[in-house]
Amino acid sequence: ISVRLVGSEMCIRDRVATDNDLDDSIMAGYSFQIDLNTSFTGEDSLDISLDAGNAGAAGIAEFDGNGGGDKLTVDGVSYTFPVGGATVFVGDNSDGSSLFTTACVYGGPSNTLDDCANVNAGITGGDIAAGASYDFGNGFTVATGMQTSQEVLTEESLDGVALNAAYTGENYGVSLTYSSVETSTTEEDTATAINAYYTPEGLPSISVGYETVDIGGAASTVDEKESVFAGLTWDEVGPGSLGVALGYSNIVEGSDEEYM
């Protein structure tokens, strides 16, 4: 069994929207995750994630830490195994996009930018999830995933399904992701995201992403929303890496963009 411990964070942030002598505060939060991994055959993997933290508080929630109220919880259980030439997974409290390839090399603490604009198409947060992927061996990969919040694929359940295709070259990659997620028994949202990255020699890598969502059941003037992302990453800056990014997430048509 292998064990991996990740995460701790602190943020300084203004908690009050007004501008006065009492609007500044220092906030500290913590978050950690223990990943337990084991294999029965050498080709499969049983993964269990244990989380704790208070990082869901206002002011630091953007850092996407664990906000379980200082309680240790089982965040997810999944099992990945080969079937023929494909890879299959099933999980509880897992993401239907677990086997997807998103063409983005940027990584950062911000929840808004870390998704690289693939916010809704790469389905996440399902109670029950399953998926499969296939690697053609020439840079092309395809994957599919599903997730549900109640009974599996029944008329009463709210299900989500998604498809992903990607190509990874020597120093670049592109991916396309599509999803259809039921928001009620009669309506569904459909999302399409395209991502790409390029890593030139001696220069920072470039990652871009764009997603558009058709909101089922909404009025025609507000039935679309979009996410946009662009980021640069320097791989070797001292002992680590450095990244800068700009973008916005889930902006409904007709609304002003709120860049981060």
Which positions does each model-derived feature cover?
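Detector for outer-membrane/organellar transmembrane beta-barrel domains
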Residues: 156-259
